[in-house]
Amino acid sequence: GAGVAYSNYLHMNSLNPASYASVMPRSVLFNVGGEMYNTYANTADAKTSYNTFNIRDINMLIPLTKGLGFGFTMTPLSDVGYRVKMTEMDPLILANVGNVVYEYLGEGNTTQFKFGLGWNPFKNFAFGVDVIYYHGIITRNFNTVITPVISETTERTLYGKQREIYSKAGVIIGAQYNLLANDLRQFTIGMTYRPRVNLRPQSTRSIVAEANFVDTIDVQNSRFDYYLPSSFSVGLAYTTRKFGALLDYTFEKWQGLNAPDPLNGITYSNNHYIKAGVQFVPNPQDVRRYFNRMSYRLGFRYNNYYMNINGHNIDDKAITLGFGFPIRQGLSNINIGFDFGQRGLTASGVYNVPATASGGMASSRAYQMVRERYFRVSIELSLFGEDYWFLKPKYE
């Protein structure tokens, strides 16, 4: 959600390291969350659905001294999981090669670990730095089974496997400034910047052919360039004791960063995020009526996505709804959120593959775009460790 300008001693904000400076002395903030996705995907003439569950993030924030906080975050960055099987329909290939079946399988994930400091050098201003470590392993397999229709009867199979290991460090810098701050309300502007990072994964690729005997055709060990874009975010936050409003804008410079994929009609464009949200707590101090101490949240987000496929933009937009449930009379709480969103579209057509992308022979390929409608449920446990956590027990 939104939060580049948000700062609160009761909640850790992993979007901006400058917010770590707001942690109270002799307190600890700990968050852990998970999310479940229910996705309905369809093309112009087919549809499917699937469910996924992931640990979303683990956060911890502790004070080092007054105005200086240390934060740690572990967040999934990407997750790969697919299995696709296709049958060749090109009559020219069927006549000259035979029946061909393609199968693609991918699995793995990457995770980012952030270690950061937030410092409040003077009143109404905070500055922070996060060091990020990216780590993960992704495996992609493909099989091509050829059944000749003339002369030969033995199937020929081509196996390919690519394993990518990611291990790289990056940095995020952030700042927050209170344009207005008193006992009744606070109005804050926040900014973050992440320079681009070349992940340069270690790639091992092998290709094996099998017919009457097995033959290893190619084995390669190399590194290739893959960049995460530079990112700039700016946000506004207006908060009172009962009400809060957040607005964020993020720009990611993908255009011209990584090589396009003309074989599959993929190009890259700059990414724009807009996120907005409001929160209302009827009466935070009401010890008798539980529902008056609950948090009620409503939000919206829009993302034009960085991939352009076959000339089509893939927009992602969602409405979010959330509730915060206080735990007893303390400052810890359980947060539950619901997202209702849509990504992509159901366009179809024919894509012309240039000769430079298909081995010297221009060709055309039919395609169908996929539209996803998704429902996400997220659950987060937010624990606030108060002064007594730091008291040394005494026994008589």
Whereabouts are the PLM-identified features?
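N-terminal, post-signal peptide beta-strand-biased segments of exported outer-membrane/organellar beta-barrel
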Residues: 1-75, 341
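Outer-membrane beta-barrel porins/channels
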Residues: 63-396
